[in-house]
């Protein structure tokens, strides 16, 4: 095997190992709850909501940041469901698209994802000193 080929294979292997490690660490803050509904909500959230809400894309509130959610967890769930299902223009030019931009999600699926995000946010709020 030539040195060039060896280096290419080595770099590829290192990239695979690092990307797997990053992916595993990336899901770590998204804890799993015991409730069947929250387990289902977590799966929906990871597939549909994480892209914005894990990174603050377009001003999306991050559930792991208590400051982003302290005022939201006290709102009626019906309000949060409505914002997630029908879309919402928030302060500072933030925007929640209808159904997170996935028109195939049912109302019930959106509610499960919202419930998971609320539980995740409350978990991090409760962990504050």
Describe the function of each predicted region.
Residues 42, 54-82, 101-102:
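Gly/Gly-Pro-rich "capping" loops immediately C-terminal to redox-active cysteine motifs
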Residues 39-48:
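Local sequence-structure signature of Cys/Sec-based thiol-disulfide redox active-site neighborhoods
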Residues 51:
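Short, cysteine/histidine-rich loop/knuckle motifs that typically chelate Zn2+
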Residues 2-11:
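Bacterial N-terminal signal peptides that target proteins for export
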Residues 62, 83-111, 117-129:
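Axial heme c-ligation environment in periplasmic c-type cytochrome domains
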Residues 24-31:
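Cleaved targeting-peptide boundary
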Residues 19-21:
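N-terminal signal peptide c-region/cleavage motif recognized by signal peptidases
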